[in-house]
Amino acid sequence: MKVAVLPGDGIGPEVTEAALKVLRALDEAEGLGLAYEVFPFGGAAIDAFGEPFPEPTRKGVEEAEAVLLGSVGGPKWDGLPRKIRPETGLLSLRKSQDLFANLRPAKVFPGLERLSPLKEEIARGVDVLIVRELTGGIYFGEPRGMSEAEAWNTERYSKPEVERVARVAFEAARKRRKHVVSVDKANVLEVGEFWRKTVEEVGRGYPDVALEHQYVDAMAMHLVRSPARFDVVVTGNIFGDILSDLASVLPGSLGLLPSASLGRGTPVFEPVHGSAPDIAGKGLANPTAAILSAAMMLEHAFGLVELARKVEDAVAKALLEAPPPDLGGSAGTEAFTATVLRHLA
């Protein structure tokens, strides 16, 4: 288990250390053979090397089996040219590893339904995974451009691009509730028709997983009206960008949301939240998303599904027993992490 750890900026080092404490405890109990090395990334790397994704970090990522990332950015670096800002390091990291699938779970933890903007009876039981295609579609399609009179972008997908992200979704569903919803706009767009047909072809290789199709506008409505009925949702880049942000508000705090980016190279696991420089160093950061990102790493990088579920269960118990400040409690980073570790033991 060789992991490159990129703590980053702001609260990144604090929440990443919390995740590492959990991983070290599991390693001691289960003999996982955990080996990790810490590398500078984002603003911290700019301060040390003059660029957000320097060569030593790049080499460390290439040699690792997984990347555990904290958070990047902060007002200190906002005045830099765009091409060397901390956030540019994220784009370079994802591109260098050809990470084509972004996994964003949104789970309303039992007992915390009150945090959701939805009614408690609607929020109860929500546990949805959005699988977003990350490197194709209208964000990257050519031609694109703008003149004084008009602007244009191209929505384009190849069969291999759709097939590979669909497989990620079906494989994830096999470990969950065995239900995939594919989201498109096949009633209007040829790309949507192509997407739907290709996902259906991939789905035939997973007879144990149910496949359903939804138009993106209807799906947005369903995620608000009845989100608990969904398991795994797979869609293209722009629709996934929108739907994953919609789903992210369901649990009630960004501090609860992990993510994974998978592809041909080293997979990356990171919290959805930002660097929160206003609370950095105060011991107040909620490490839940970082700990759950480590759980996703156990599952998707190393196939340790049972251990990942064990971490998730410990986090769920800790959230009820010792909620962090952003959830209305008073448990700081260390106290919350200690509670998770106690429930893991």
From Swiss-Prot:
NAD(+) binds at residues 74-87, 274-286. Catalyzes the oxidation of 3-carboxy-2-hydroxy-4-methylpentanoate (3-isopropylmalate) to 3-carboxy-4-methyl-2-oxopentanoate. The product decarboxylates to 4-methyl-2 oxopentanoate. Belongs to the isocitrate and isopropylmalate dehydrogenases family. LeuB type 1 subfamily. Its main location: cytoplasm. It catalyses: (2R,3S)-3-isopropylmalate + NAD(+) = 4-methyl-2-oxopentanoate + CO2 + NADH. GO terms for biological process: L-leucine biosynthetic process. The keyword Cell inner membrane does not apply. The record marks 139, 185 as: Important for catalysis. InterPro entries: IsoCit/isopropylmalate_DH_CS (IPR019818), IsoPropMal-DH-like_dom (IPR024084), Isopropylmalate_DH (IPR004429). One of its GO terms (molecular function) is magnesium ion binding. Binds 1 Mg(2+) or Mn(2+) ion per subunit. The keyword ATP-binding does not apply. Its cofactor is Mg(2+); Mn(2+). It is an enzyme of class 1 (oxidoreductase). Its EC number is 1.1.1.85. SUPFAM superfamilies: Isocitrate/Isopropylmalate dehydrogenase-like (SSF53659). Substrate binds at residues 94, 104, 132, 217. Mg(2+) binds at residues 217, 241, 245. This is 3-isopropylmalate dehydrogenase. Keywords: Amino-acid biosynthesis, Branched-chain amino acid biosynthesis, Cytoplasm, Leucine biosynthesis, Magnesium, Manganese, Metal-binding, NAD, Oxidoreductase. It comes from the Bacteria. It is found in: Cytoplasm. One of its GO terms (cellular component) is cytosol. Pathway: Amino-acid biosynthesis; L-leucine biosynthesis; L-leucine from 3-methyl-2-oxobutanoate: step 3/4. It comes from Thermus thermophilus (strain ATCC BAA-163 / DSM 7039 / HB27). Homodimer.
